[in-house]
Amino acid sequence: MITKQSSNVLRKKRHLRLRKIVSGTSQRPRLNVFRSNKFLYVQIIDDTQQTTLCSANSKESNVLGSNIKAAEAVGALIAKKALAQGIKNVVFDRSGYLYHGKIKALADACRKSGLQF
């Protein structure tokens, strides 16, 4: 019997494939994105030391929710926190999500606020 896998299972497989290639260092940490039904979470991770350097989510930002405006607010917030810690270059880890909509808005807001990836 052929069954269709859920989109979240397929996303996790894509994420594992990406994680074999993408890793963050102390000079260029990894910007990780997680998207839930209600909120958007972003964290900057140093994979060599396995520590989270800074994080932001749509609960902290002015715009609650998981829409494109919230993604832009979270992107600006994480860029502000990263620049305060002296982080300018990051590796973008989209966690298997398509580079479209909220993920693209978040990345564009980070770039506009001064992060480079």
From Swiss-Prot:
The lineage of its organism: Bacteria, Bacillati, Mycoplasmatota, Mollicutes, Acholeplasmatales. GO terms for biological process: translation. It comes from the Bacteria. PANTHER family: 39S RIBOSOMAL PROTEIN L18, MITOCHONDRIAL, LARGE RIBOSOMAL SUBUNIT PROTEIN UL18M. The keyword Cell division does not apply. SUPFAM superfamilies: Translational machinery components. The keyword Ribosomal protein applies. GO terms for molecular function: 5S rRNA binding; structural constituent of ribosome. This is Large ribosomal subunit protein uL18. The gene is rplR. Part of the 50S ribosomal subunit; part of the 5S rRNA/L5/L18/L25 subcomplex. Contacts the 5S and 23S rRNAs. Coiled coil: none annotated. Pfam families: Ribosomal_L18p. Signal peptide: none annotated. This is one of the proteins that bind and probably mediate the attachment of the 5S RNA into the large ribosomal subunit, where it forms part of the central protuberance. InterPro entries: Ribosomal_uL18_bac-type, Ribosomal_uL18_bac/euk. Belongs to the universal ribosomal protein uL18 family. Keywords: Ribonucleoprotein, Ribosomal protein, RNA-binding, rRNA-binding. GO terms for cellular component: cytosolic large ribosomal subunit.
